[in-house]
Swiss-Prot record:
The encoding gene: hslV
InterPro entries (UniProt xref): ATP-dep_Prtase_HsIV_su (IPR022281), Ntn_hydrolases_N (IPR029055), Proteasome_sua/b (IPR001353), Proteasome_suB-type (IPR023333)
PROSITE patterns in UniProt: PROTEASOME_BETA_2
Activity modulation comment: Allosterically activated by HslU binding.
Protein name per UniProt: ATP-dependent protease subunit HslV
């Protein structure tokens, strides 16, 4: 059976960066956990990080990413590129199955094990099974309302949880 889970969304707007993750972990056709924590602050509280995929793999990548952040003096983009290079070329790391979503006040990045570091044009990004729904909702709210980043994230995650069966409404939110 396959573990399925997660929607993690980040929105950066008007000087605020807000990330949210749902709490559901699904194994096959069974919900195993409702309150998983898939996001956290790292880098002395200046960086938000979330994951989709294997929890053990994500924790290993969080630790490595935090080391890269320290090594590169908090430069999010450089740390992300260096992690992606290691992840792609290291034989052990290459086997890790996770996606990372990281953000600071200025940058939003998705990091994958294939060496990709993607910076969205509009500072809105999501990973996981509910990502398309969360991104669509966030972009619609950004384009048509004056809501702040936190309100956009809350409403978008609620919408994603109503559509994606692998996403629940038990949302954890972090803000910088």
């Amino acid at each position: 059976m396959e573990w399925k889970s997660t929607t993690v969304l980040v929105v950066s707007r008007n000087g605020k960066t807000v990330m949210a993750g749902d709490g559901q972990v699904t194994y096959g056709n069974t919900v195993m956990k409702h309150g998983a924590r898939k996001i956290r602050k790292i880098g002395d509280g200046q960086v938000l990080a979330g994951f989709a995929g294997s929890v053990a793999d994500a924790m290993a990548l969080f630790d490595r990413f935090e080391s890269k952040l320290k090594e590169w003096g908090g430069n999010l983009t450089k740390a992300a590129v260096e992690l992606a290079k290691d992840w792609r070329t290291d034989r052990v790391l290459r086997r890790l199955e996770a996606l990372l979503l990281v953000a600071d006040r200025d940058n939003v990045l998705i990091i994958s094990g294939t060496g990709e570091v993607v910076q969205p044009d509009d500072n809105v990004a999501a990973i996981g099974s509910g990502a398309p729904y969360a991104i669509a909702a966030a972009r619609a709210l950004i384009r048509n309302t004056d809501l702040d980043a936190r309100e956009i994230v809350e409403k978008s995650m609620q919408i994603a949880s109503e559509i994606c069966i692998y996403t629940n409404g038990n949302i954890t939110i972090e803000e910088i």
